[in-house]
Amino acid sequence: MGLKIAVTVKPNAKKAQVVELAEKQYRVAVREAAQDGKANQALVDILADHFGVAKSTVKIIRGHAARHKLIEIG
């Protein structure tokens, strides 16, 4: 079982970034629109890069179609 974090996603952002709001709580801005899973894929890519893990280890547990998501890393 890996690290679980709460993430609020901001799609269509000018700049992609990860901001830690509190322990295990993040706000992630992605440049992609929330259409056809593009923002979710961008979220996985950004979090994998931020935490230094493979993309395959980052999973969306809850909130596939919502801005507030539960992510498992590892």
Language-model features, listed with the residues they occupy:
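Short secondary-structure boundary micro-motifs
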Residues: 1-4, 11, 34-36, 43, ...
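Compact, glycine-rich, soluble single-domain proteins
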Residues: 21-51
